[in-house]
Regions:
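Catalytic cores of nucleic-acid endonucleases
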Residues: 118-163
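Short beta-strand-loop-alpha-helix junction that forms the active-site gateway
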Residues: 94-127
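Conserved phosphate-coordination/catalytic loops
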Residues: 53-54, 88-89, 120-124
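Short, basic, helix/turn surface patches
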Residues: 103, 159-173
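Solvent-exposed, charged helical/coil patches
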Residues: 1-82, 171-173
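Active-site metal-binding core of divalent-cation-utilizing nuclease and nuclease-like domains
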Residues: 71-107
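A short, structure-level motif marking secondary-structure boundaries and short turns
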Residues: 43-46, 113-116, 164, 170-171
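Residue-level detector of flexible, active-site-proximal loop/helix-junction positions
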Residues: 78, 114, 147
Length: 173
């Protein structure tokens, strides 16, 4: 499938539970991926197990398709000196992804409407959370689940462009 033609969860009829706690007993990401015709690169299998949504899985899978990405089987993936981690605790929050290069820390959040809802209270909580993260030294980068699933490569381009503009290093692609 071409990148712009990737199906969303509703089209697949398969929904990856939002959190691990919501996953039914015996839930297996690889079984979900096979049913969703979602190929997981072999070297990414242990890292991608940490995702908590289908949208995150699309973005992480795309990360492993970028030339120059290094992964040794641990908690981080590396790209030109930047460390990328999944489900990172930060104060009372857990961040979908953290991309860190030297002192620069990006908090990458990927959420769909089902997570946020359309209530004023949730909207206010999201803005409050973003401010707390910024006070803690993070640059907050947000993507919709739709963007992550249909344009995962562009999400990474944006992340690395933001990182590049905040660093003096020109080697980041």
């Amino acid at each position: 499938m071409a990148e712009a033609e990737l199906p969303d969860e509703a089209q697949l009829g398969l929904r990856l539970p939002e959190t691990r706690a919501q996953r039914p007993s015996g839930f297996d990401l690889e079984t979900w991926a096979a049913a969703a015709r979602f190929d997981i690169p072999e070297r990414a299998a242990s890292f991608i197990q940490r995702v908590e949504s289908a949208a995150e899985a699309y973005v992480v899978r795309e990360l492993f398709r970028i030339p120059g990405v290094l992964y040794d089987g641990g908690a981080s993936v590396y790209y030109h000196g930047a460390a990328i981690r999944l489900q990172v605790p930060a104060s009372v929050y857990r961040l979908d992804l953290v991309v860190q290069f030297e002192e620069i820390r990006l908090a990458v959040e990927i959420d769909g409407l089902e997570h946020h809802g359309l209530t004023q209270a949730q909207f206010a909580r999201d803005y409050y959370r973003a401010r707390r993260l910024m006070i803690g030294g993070f640059v907050v980068v947000r993507f919709t689940a739709s963007e992550a699933m249909t344009q995962p490569r562009q999400c990474w381009r944006d992340v690395f462009a933001i990182l590049k503009t905040r660093s003096s290093i020109e080697r980041l692609a």
